[in-house]
Structure formats: C-alpha cells, structure tokens
C-alpha cells in the first residue's frame, strides 16, 4: 500500500478467471458502506471492471469470440493506454466516460458517465500487468483459487449469464484461459500488497481488508479536516492566503 494518504483511494483486485474477484469487491463495498454509516460519514464508491477496457474487436474476431475461439486473456486485448488515462483522470477528480462492454456480443455499447468518488475499486484478470496502472493503485489485491474451482465457477457463470455451450467454454478455457493465466496473470501476483487465498470463501481476509481500508479512509478524512482547520485559522490571522485568491 502507498505510504502517502490521500483521496481518492484506488483499489485494484486481480486474479484468475472466476476466482471470486467480483464477490470480494462486493463484500468490501458492503463493509465500507456499513462502517461509514456507523461513523456518520458518507463514502462514495465506484466499482469498475477491466472488461470496460477491452479493445474493439473486428467482425471476424467477434465470430471467433462467439465460438469460443478467441483469446480475451492476452494483454494485447486490453486498452491499457485508455485505462491508465481514465484512472489518472479519476484520481484528479474529473468526471469520466467509461465504455460499456457487452459480454454476450463481445462489443462496446456506448459509455456510462462516472462522477468523482472517494473510493474507486477496479477488478480484472490482468489488472496488475501494466506498470502505469500499478503505479496509480493505492492498494493492490490478488485473489487466489484452485484451477478446478475456477473452471467450475466459469462454467456455471457463462452458461447462466452468457448462454454459452459447455464444450465451447471448456475448449476456450483449455486453449486460451488457462495458458494465459500461467503466462500473464499468475506472475503479477508478486506486485500485490495482499494475496487472498481461497477466493471468495475467505471471509476473514475480506473483512480485514475492508477494516484496513476504512481506517485508512478515516485517517485521510481526519487529516484533511485538520489541515482545513489550520488553513482557516491562518486565513483569520491574515498570515495565509488561499491559492488563486485575490487581494482585498
């Protein structure tokens, strides 16, 4: 985790396909919101997916994708330039347009406007692959789950949500997903601040991470409030002038 405490907090969650990243993010958000409510503070949280930063496929590639013959897990399929630019703009407090990715048609479908937030959580298999992105993250998490469980979860999800045939899912997993995980995803575990074993089954780790993030958020807010109080006091004394203020 970064030593410098400042908002927004940008949390990255990486790990293999269907290892429980989304479930873990949802639990972290739930815990953060619950803790914030108890302390009487409001916390704005944005949840993003690396899917939004897939590059646009050609017509031929979309056909291959529908047949389970396209490798989505290779780094070349991610627009890391756009991802790094978007995250930097969010850190700078700017409103951004996030592409909307349709998992069924393997295509982009417009954008969604995202306002500035105090906590930004983004998840994706190759999230820790690009150095520029890693440098922007306040906290980097890597979720581990055994290969058999990940394949079982992937089968259930892709059959239920994307209407994919089981044999197509298994073929794509064997030919592309598993080899790409070993070559590109697993090695990025070394960049993680925290490794979460057993995936979404690890409630203890999720709760501890949420508590740590909540405490970090509290310290930032308190520090910011104290700085503002000092600044206001100096302004009253006439020994401090806020940036860009005009002389009276």
Swiss-Prot record:
Q: Where does ATP bind?
A: 15-23, 201
The enzyme's E.C. designation: 2.7.1.48
Q: Which reaction does it catalyse?
A: uridine + ATP = UMP + ADP + H(+); cytidine + ATP = CMP + ADP + H(+)
Q: Where is this region: Disordered?
A: 224-248
Q: State the GO CC annotations.
A: cytoplasm
Q: Which residues bind substrate?
A: 73, 101, 154, 164, 172
Tell me what this protein is called: Probable uridine-cytidine kinase
Organism taxonomic ancestry? Eukaryota, Metazoa, Ecdysozoa, Nematoda, Chromadorea
């Amino acid at each position: 985790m970064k030593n410098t405490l400042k908002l927004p907090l940008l949390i990255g969650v990486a790990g293999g396909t269907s290892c429980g990243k989304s479930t873990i993010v949802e639990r972290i958000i739930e815990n953060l919101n619950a803790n914030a409510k108890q302390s009487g503070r409001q916390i704005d949280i944005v949840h993003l997916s690396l899917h939004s930063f897939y590059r646009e496929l050609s017509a031929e590639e979309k056909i291959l994708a529908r047949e389970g013959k396209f490798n989505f897990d290779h780094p070349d399929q991610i627009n890391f330039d756009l991802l790094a630019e978007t995250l930097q703009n969010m850190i700078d407090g700017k409103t951004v347009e996030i592409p909307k990715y349709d998992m069924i048609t393997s295509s982009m479908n417009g954008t969604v406007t995202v306002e500035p937030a105090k906590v930004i959580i983004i998840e994706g298999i190759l999230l820790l692959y690009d150095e520029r992105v890693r440098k922007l993250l306040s906290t980097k998490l890597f979720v581990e789950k055994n290969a058999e469980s990940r394949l079982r979860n992937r089968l259930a999800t892709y059959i239920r949500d994307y209407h994919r045939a089981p044999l197509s899912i298994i073929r794509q997993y064997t030919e592309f997903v598993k080899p790409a995980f070993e070559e590109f995803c697993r090695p990025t575990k070394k960049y993680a601040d925290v490794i979460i074993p057993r995936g979404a089954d690890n409630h203890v780790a999720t709760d501890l991470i949420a508590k740590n993030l909540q405490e970090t958020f509290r310290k930032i807010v308190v520090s910011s409030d104290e700085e503002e109080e000092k600044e206001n006091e100096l302004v009253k004394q006439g020994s401090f002038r806020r940036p860009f203020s005009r002389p009276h």
